[in-house]
């Protein structure tokens, strides 16, 4: 079972709460996904008013753990300030830390990310950093005190799936004691299964479910994909080969097939 800081869960699927056709569909999709952790944006909910209260009521009804994020922040100062506001609003020291460097790719500002993570951890936060698949960046985040690291599969909302499989595998091999979550870029349940097959502890996604023709059915499909991927990893996947290997044994071949 995946462990996030001092809390253990059963689901390996974390899910976002944005972009759904309606609040009711959001609730149904989250239930169908089996997710126990949902991400929420402070910027969305801090807008205040009745809409924010109604959204928070829907989330409470789901009986899930809330992971606030700093989505949209483009500087260390902005991310740190947003994280502190989120702690006050949601009553949790958990924060999904995002510091964005580029508006087109939404690529993380890895230098600012490490700096912000260091500041927040010293202030008592438990940080879930959204980063690239770069090993040196992940290592710096771990050295700063992060016990969870969340590398992307591909740019947010791209639905491309895992672009750099070798780099993600290297992260898993080099950080065996860190909870690793593939975050962003997953577009199909098979992408989630692939991440879990690599030994990742969980995946986080939003758009692939929220923008599906049937978000509830897609959420269920991702749940099954995660289950399949983790089961395959635990069962032990065979190594890929460059050449064919017969699956039918030669022993017991009928005599008329024997070569003279």
UniProtKB/Swiss-Prot annotation:
Pathway given in the UniProt record: Cofactor biosynthesis; thiamine diphosphate biosynthesis
EC number: 2.8.1.10
One GO CC term, this protein: cytoplasm
Described purpose of this protein according to its UniProt entry: Catalyzes the rearrangement of 1-deoxy-D-xylulose 5-phosphate (DXP) to produce the thiazole phosphate moiety of thiamine. Sulfur is provided by the thiocarboxylate moiety of the carrier protein ThiS. In vitro, sulfur can be provided by H(2)S.
Family: Belongs to the ThiG family.
Binding site for 1-deoxy-D-xylulose 5-phosphate: 157, 184-185, 206-207
Catalysed reactions listed for this entry: [ThiS sulfur-carrier protein]-C-terminal-Gly-aminoethanethioate + 2-iminoacetate + 1-deoxy-D-xylulose 5-phosphate = [ThiS sulfur-carrier protein]-C-terminal Gly-Gly + 2-[(2R,5Z)-2-carboxy-4-methylthiazol-5(2H)-ylidene]ethyl phosphate + 2 H2O + H(+)
Active-site residues, as the UniProt record annotates them: 96 (schiff-base intermediate with dxp)
Protein name: Thiazole synthase
Main location per the UniProt record: cytoplasm
Protein encoded by which gene: thiG
Annotated GO biological process: thiamine diphosphate biosynthetic process
InterPro entries registered for this protein in UniProt: Aldolase_TIM, Thiazole_synthase_ThiG, ThiG
Record text on subunit structure and interactions: Homotetramer. Forms heterodimers with either ThiH or ThiS.
Enzyme class: transferase
Lineage: Bacteria, Pseudomonadati, Pseudomonadota, Alphaproteobacteria, Hyphomicrobiales
Sample GO molecular function, one term: thiazole synthase activity
Keywords noted in UniProt: Cytoplasm, Schiff base, Thiamine biosynthesis, Transferase
A Pfam family assignment: ThiG
Subcellular location field: Cytoplasm
């Amino acid at each position: 079972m995946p462990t996030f800081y001092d809390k253990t869960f059963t689901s390996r699927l974390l899910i976002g709460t944005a972009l759904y056709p309606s609040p009711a569909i959001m609730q149904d999709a989250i239930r169908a996904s089996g997710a126990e952790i949902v991400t929420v944006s402070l910027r969305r909910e801090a807008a205040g008013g009745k809409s924010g209260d109604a959204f928070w009521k829907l989330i409470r009804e789901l009986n899930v753990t809330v992971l606030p994020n700093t989505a949209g922040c483009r500087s260390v100062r902005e991310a740190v300030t947003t994280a502190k506001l989120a702690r006050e609003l949601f009553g949790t020291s958990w924060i999904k830390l995002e510091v964005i460097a580029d508006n087109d790719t939404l690529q993380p500002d890895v230098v600012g990310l490490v700096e912000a993570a260091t500041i927040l951890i010293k202030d008592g936060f438990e940080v879930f950093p959204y980063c690239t698949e770069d090993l040196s960046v992940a290592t710096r985040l771990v050295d700063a005190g992060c016990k969870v690291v969340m590398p992307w599969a591909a740019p947010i909302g791209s639905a491309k799936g895992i672009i750099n499989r070798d780099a993600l595998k290297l992260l898993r091999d080099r950080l065996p004691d860190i909870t690793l979550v593939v975050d962003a870029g997953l577009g199909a349940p098979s992408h989630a299964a692939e991440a879990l097959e690599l030994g990742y502890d969980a995946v986080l996604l939003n758009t692939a479910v929220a923008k599906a023709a049937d978000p509830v059915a897609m959420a269920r499909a991702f749940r099954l994909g995660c289950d399949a991927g983790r089961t395959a990893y635990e069962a032990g996947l065979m190594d890929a080969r460059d050449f064919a290997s017969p699956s039918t044994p030669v022993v017991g071949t009928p005599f008329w097939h024997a070569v003279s």
